[in-house]
C-alpha cells in the first residue's frame, strides 16, 4: 500500500475518532465472512461503524484523541467499532455478538468519555436500558411530584365538601 493511501486512511480514521462518543476494540480471529457481514449489518442498524484497521495505523490515527489510551490493546487482529450516537446500543450489539460467537469474536476494550473500559464494563454498559427508556424514566420521576400535587389539590375541595356535609348532617340530626 502506498504511503499516501495510508496517510489518507489515518487522516480519515483520526477524524472519525474525534467525532466518536465511544470506541470499542475486538479480536475477530477465526470469524467467517457470513458472521462478519451479520455483525456489520447489526452495528449499522445501531449507527455504529465497524472496520478492520491495521494496528499501527490505528495507533497513529488515535494520537491526540480520546482513543489514544487504547494503544496497549492493539495486538493481533483488531476490529474497531465506532459509535457516534449511542454507546449503550453499540455495547449491546457487540456484547450479544461476542456471547453468541463463543470465542470467535472477543471484545478487548473500549473508550468512553476518555476513559478505558474493560470487557466487564462494556457488559455493564450493555445491561443499561436504552437511552429512550432512561429518558422516559427520568421524565416520569420528574412528573410524579407534579401529579401528586395536583392530586392533593383536587382532594382538598372534596374533603371540605365532605366535612361541611358532615357538619350539616350533625346539625340536622340535633
Swiss-Prot record:
Taken from the record, one Pfam family name reads Ribosomal_L10
Q: Which GO terms describe its cellular component?
A: large ribosomal subunit
Q: Which PROSITE patterns match?
A: RIBOSOMAL_L10
Gene Ontology BP terms = translation
Q: Name one GO molecular function term.
A: structural constituent of ribosome
Q: Which UniProt keywords apply?
A: Ribonucleoprotein, Ribosomal protein, RNA-binding, rRNA-binding
Which protein family is named in the record? Belongs to the universal ribosomal protein uL10 family.
Q: Describe the function of this protein.
A: Forms part of the ribosomal stalk, playing a central role in the interaction of the ribosome with GTP-bound translation factors.
For this protein, the record's NCBIfam families field holds: PRK00099.1-1
Q: What is this protein called?
A: Large ribosomal subunit protein uL10
Q: Which gene encodes it?
A: rplJ
Amino acid at each position: 500500500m502506498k504511503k499516501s493511501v495510508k496517510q489518507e486512511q489515518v487522516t480519515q480514521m483520526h477524524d472519525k475518532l474525534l467525532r466518536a462518543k465511544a470506541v470499542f476494540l475486538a479480536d475477530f480471529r477465526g470469524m467467517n465472512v457470513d458472521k462478519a457481514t451479520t455483525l456489520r449489518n447489526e452495528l449499522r442498524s445501531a449507527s455504529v461503524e465497524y472496520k478492520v484497521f491495521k494496528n499501527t495505523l490505528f495507533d497513529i490515527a488515535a494520537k491526540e484523541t480520546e482513543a489514544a489510551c487504547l494503544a496497549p490493546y492493539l495486538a493481533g487482529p483488531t476490529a474497531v467499532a465506532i459509535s457516534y450516537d449511542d454507546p449503550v446500543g453499540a455495547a449491546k450489539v457487540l456484547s450479544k455478538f461476542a456471547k453468541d460467537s463463543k470465542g470467535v469474536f472477543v471484545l478487548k476494550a473500549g473508550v468512553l468519555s476518555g476513559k478505558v473500559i474493560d470487557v466487564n464494563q462494556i457488559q455493564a454498559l450493555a445491561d443499561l436500558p436504552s437511552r429512550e427508556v432512561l429518558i422516559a424514566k427520568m421524565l416520569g420521576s420528574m412528573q410524579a411530584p407534579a401529579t401528586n400535587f395536583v392530586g392533593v389539590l383536587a382532594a382538598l375541595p372534596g374533603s371540605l365538601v365532605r366535612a361541611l356535609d358532615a357538619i350539616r348532617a350533625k346539625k340536622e340530626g340535633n
